[in-house]
A protein has these predicted regions:
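A short beta-strand-turn-helix
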Residues: 25-43
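Typically the conserved alpha-helix immediately C-terminal to a functionally engaged Cys/Sec
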Residues: 55-72
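Thiol-based oxidoreductase modules, predominantly thioredoxin-like and allied folds used
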Residues: 24-25, 68-96
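C-type cytochrome heme c attachment motif
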Residues: 50-57, 112-114
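Non-catalytic, surface beta->alpha helical segment in thiol-disulfide oxidoreductase systems
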Residues: 102-158
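Extracellular/periplasmic catalytic domains that process cell-envelope and extracellular macromolecules
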Residues: 37-38, 69-72, 105-109
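Bacterial Sec-dependent N-terminal signal peptides
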Residues: 1-23
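Short active-site neighborhood of thiol/selenol oxidoreductases, capturing the structured segment around
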Residues: 39-52, 77
Length: 172
């Protein structure tokens, strides 16, 4: 009887974990705005998904030892999960897809990112000068446009922007 009770408890706890929904997008953003106001930073929002290799690359680059402090000193970075497969829909932040649509980015691929002020006003996004999503910038041209956007929305110096450029540019 004891074993059945223990197994039942494990099953129920496992079910609760699977059923746990993600925070809605507005809550995630409100938390980021509050922190950014306190720290005098901008909000860097990245729309991503668990299956997205370029999303993982973007996060890895931003969290690299060379870049982490540079981004952390200038931005409150937050992630909104979108475009998950049917079996992983529970990973999505409710309202994130609507927010992606608001930025006219529903069909442009991910990662898609925006940089906002503490009131939620759009300062820049990941569209390049041709209207294409930079996503995780990797070519010299993409990284150049990314760095220009960072320069306009941060206090990063030329030397610091050069570090970001080196980390993001794919070496051939």
């Amino acid at each position: 009887m004891k074993i059945k009770s223990i197994l039942l408890c494990i099953f129920l706890l496992g079910s609760l974990t699977v059923a746990h929904a993600q925070e809605d997008a507005s809550t995630v953003l409100q938390t980021a705005y509050t922190q950014a106001k306190k720290e005098n930073k901008k909000v860097f929002v990245i729309f991503h998904a668990s299956w997205c290799g370029w999303c993982k690359k973007m996060e890895k680059n931003m969290q690299s030892p060379s870049c982490k402090k540079l981004f952390d000193n200038n931005y409150v970075t937050t992630f909104l999960t979108v475009q998950e497969s049917p079996k992983n829909k529970n990973l999505e932040n409710p309202g994130a897809a609507d927010l992606l649509a608001k930025y006219k980015a529903s069909g442009v691929g991910i990662p898609f990112w925006v940089i906002l002020d503490t009131d939620g006003t759009l300062l820049t996004d990941s569209f390049n000068s041709k209207g294409e999503n930079l996503g995780c910038p990797a070519t010299a041209e993409e990284v150049g446009e990314f760095v220009t956007k960072l320069k306009k929305t941060s206090k990063l110096t030329k030397a610091q922007l050069d570090v970001v450029s080196q980390v993001f540019t794919i070496k051939k």
